[in-house]
Amino acid sequence: MHCRIFTLADQIAFAELSGDNNPLHVDPVVARRSLFGQPIAHGVHTLMWALDEWLEGRTAPVRFKQLRVAFLKQIGLNQEVRFNLVSQQNNRVRIDVIKENEVAVRMVFEWLADEASYRGNVSPDLPEQQPPDLLGEEEIRRSHGFLDLYLQPETARRLFPNLARFLSPVQSAVLLGMTRLVGVKCPGLQSIFSELNLTADAADDGQRIKYAVAEFDERYGLVLLTVAAPRLRGTIRAFIRPPPQAQASFENLKPLVGDAAFAEQRALVIGGSRGLGEVTAKLLAAAGAHVQLTYRMGKSDAERIVGEIIEGGGQASLCELDILRPDWSGLTLPTHLYYFASPLISGSAKADFSSALFHAFCDYYVNGFAAIVELFQKKGLRNVFYPSTVFIDEMPANFLEYAMAKQAGEMLCQAFEKKYPQMRFYCPRLPKMATDQTVSFHQVQNPDPVPILLTALQNFGDSIVSR
C-alpha cells in the first residue's frame, strides 16, 4: 500500500522547488488563523507525489495528453494519505488520493510516450521566493501575465525521483508553475487551488506560462483562469479564502462596560490571543481587571492585544503556555480563571464517530483544564469561567466528539464544585459566533461575540465568590 504523510519539512522543500511559499502551506502561525486552522499540503505537491507513485517501475519517458485534477479535501500536515490506482485502461488512468476514507484528490489523465523532441526553455535554478500578492477584487478581474518555468534537477530528483526520470521536464515545470501561479500571483495570498485542467496543444510552443482571469464571481470567491504553457493549454479553478476574523478593538469595547466593574479581578485568560479569548480579555480589561492572557503559537497576536489594552489605559500582560505540555512558571496567581484553550474544532468525516478526535478534544477541554484548576485551587483560586457549547443540546452529527468533550468538561466542573465547595464554576453554553474557528467559504453571518460574551461575563460576575 502506497501511503504518505506530509510534514512541514516536506512542505518547505516543495515551496523551494515550486516557488509557492504561501504561508497557508509553510507557516504554522499564520495558517492557524485560516479556515483550516493549520498548514495544509499544496494540492500540486499531492498531485506530483501521486504521479511519482504511478511512475514507479516505468522504463520509458511519458508526457500528458490530457490531465484533469480536482482538489476535493484539504490534507493537513502529519495526516496519512493513501495512493489508490482506481483504473488503468490503455493510456487512460484514474488515481485517487484518499484521506480518512474520503477522496482528497482525484486525477484523470491520458499519457503518451515522450519522444523527447521538445524541451522548452526551463531554467535549472530554483525560483525566487516572492511574498504572495494580496489582490483586491478589481485587481483579480484584470489579472494577467507570464511566469517563467523552473525545474531544479537535484531538488526535483530528491522529492520526485520517478517524475524526474520519466516525465517530460517541461510538464513537470508547468505543474510547479501552476501552484506558484495560484499561491503567489493570482488569486495569491488568500487562495485555495480547486481544479486544474490541461490538454496537449502542439501549436503552442511558447516558452513561459501565460495566464489571464476569464471569470471572477465575488459572491463565492471563485476565480477561473485560462493558462497556456509550452505544448499545453487549459484552465484553473481557484477560490479566495476568507481572511482571519477580526475582533472588536479595545477602544470600541470600553464604552460597553463600567471601567471598574471587574477592578478586583486578576484574570487569567487561557487562550487569549484570538477569538473568544481575545474578546474576553479586552472586555475584562476594559472593566478594570488586570488581565494575563496566554498564547501557544500566536505571540504576535498576543502582543498586539496586550499593546492595544495598555495603550487604551488597561492593564494586561502575556505568557506563553501550551496546555498539553505546560510550563506554569510564567503565570501569575489569578482570582478568576477563564479557560478558552482549544484545538481546531473540526467535524468527523461522514458523521462517523472518531475516538481519536474525541480524545484530542478531551486533552484540551478535560485533561488540560483539570491540570490548571488543580494547580491554582491549592493557591486560592475560587472562580472559574468554562465556556461550553449549545452543540450539547443541538448535537449536530458531524460534531459529536466536540459536544461530548465539552459535556465531559461540564461534568468535571460539577465534580470540582463537590470536591472544592469553596469554588464556583460557570459553564455557559455559548452559540456559534464569528471567530477564526467558524469562518467558511459560504457567506454565513455568525453572531458578534461581544454582546454574548458581555452578558456571560456579567452573569459570571454576579455569581463569583469573594476571597
Describe each region flagged by the PLM.
Residues M1-P39, S117-P169:
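Catalytic strand-loop segment that frames the active site of acyl-thioester-processing enzymes
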Residues N21, R32, P39-R63, T155-N197:
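Active-site helix/loop of acyl-thioester processing domains in fatty-acid/polyketide metabolism
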Residues A289-R304:
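Conserved glycine-rich Rossmann-like NAD(P)H-binding loop of the short-chain dehydrogenase/reductase
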Residues I309-P326:
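Rossmann-fold cofactor-recognition segment
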Residues K254, S342-Y420, R429-D436, H442:
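Catalytic loop of short-chain dehydrogenase/reductase
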Residues S273-R274:
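Conserved glycine-rich cofactor-binding loop
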Residues M1-I5, T59, F64-E138, S194-A267:
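HotDog/MaoC-like acyl-thioester-processing domains
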